From Swiss-Prot:
It comes from Saccharomyces cerevisiae (strain ATCC 204508 / S288c) (Baker's yeast). Belongs to the short-chain dehydrogenases/reductases (SDR) family. This is NADP-dependent 3-hydroxy acid dehydrogenase. Homotetramer. Gene3D superfamilies: NAD(P)-binding Rossmann-like Domain. Its main location: cytoplasm. NADP-dependent dehydrogenase with broad substrate specificity acting on 3-hydroxy acids. Catalyzes the NADP-dependent oxidation of L-allo-threonine to L-2-amino-3-keto-butyrate, which is spontaneously decarboxylated into aminoacetone. Also acts on D-threonine, L-serine, D-serine, D-3-hydroxyisobutyrate, L-3-hydroxyisobutyrate, D-glycerate and L-glycerate.
């Protein structure tokens, strides 16, 4: 049996919750799951931008008519809304099998001493606190059936800190530490905890970081070939479609011409 067919069988009928699903890696992951499963999955797609989610759902309905999709406008930084969101999912989407904690952001490139307090709070609320809150809300579902996959999106910034990125780096180090601790807490279960740490990926990430400045965002990827969102999505789907006795616990994924945050060949 081919690897693709095995993956499709392992993913068939499963329900996956993806945060930050309206664009970038989240959107690509939704589509990659349906490609890998021949459309035989249920997707819960959560993000702030409902109109983008509805556009994605239309695309899915056309390309994968057998797939079931639930879209939800959700600001993951509003902690009080997380648990009710999970509890009030439609009945056919309640039995979540895979959680992809994808939502994340960076803001600015200020040095310590110049960073706005609200930016510090926003980055940690999104990248760390929300990820923990969603994991805590979904984990009882996994514990009840002794199975499930938790995928946390880390970053090379969570392994190799760099100047002018202190808050983002700190938040991603926190994600790595939380993921490692959680994996150890769940060692006596069949729940898999997976960290995917990308390097340079061309998405809306830099546009958000530089507050809509397109020129600054484009310069991040200038004269090099970054990863694309579907490259990371492919790895997420691969990791969650392995045999139950296997966990791709911690993976760093770079474009070919990158070796660290500031070792990127441009030419």
């Amino acid at each position: 049996m081919s690897q693709g067919r095995k993956a499709a069988e392992r993913l068939a009928k499963k329900t996956v919750l993806i945060t930050g699903a309206s664009a970038g890696i989240g959107k690509a992951t939704a589509l990659e799951y349906l490609e890998a499963s021949n459309g035989d999955m249920k997707l819960i797609l959560a993000a702030r931008r409902l109109e983008k989610l509805e556009e994605l759902k239309k695309t899915i309905d056309q390309e994968f008519p057998n797939a079931k999709v639930h879209v939800a406008q959700l600001d993951i930084t509003q902690a009080e809304k997380i648990k009710p969101f999970i509890e009030n999912l439609p009945q056919e989407f309640k039995d979540i099998d895979i959680l992809v904690n994808n939502a994340g952001k960076a803001l600015g490139s200020d040095r310590v001493g110049q960073i706005a307090t609200e930016d510090i709070q926003d980055v940690f609320d999104t990248n760390v606190t929300a990820l923990i809150n969603i994991t805590q809300a979904v984990l009882p579902i996994f514990q009840a059936k002794n199975s499930g996959d938790i995928v946390n999106l880390g970053s090379i910034a969570g392994r190799d800190a760099y100047p002018t990125g202190s808050i983002y780096c700190a938040s991603k180090f926190a994600v790595g530490a939380f993921t490692d601790s959680l994996r150890k807490e769940l060692i006596n279960t069949k729940i898999r905890v997976i960290l995917i740490a990308p390097g340079l990926v061309e998405t809306e990430f830099s546009l958000v970081r530089y507050r809509g400045n397109e020129e600054q965002a484009k310069n991040v990827y200038k004269d090099t070939t970054p990863l694309m969102a579907d490259d990371v999505a492919d790895l997420i789907v691969y990791a969650t479609s392995r045999k139950q006795n296997t966990v791709i616990a911690d993976t760093l994924i770079f474009p070919t011409n990158q070796a660290s945050p500031h070792h990127i060949f441009r030419g």
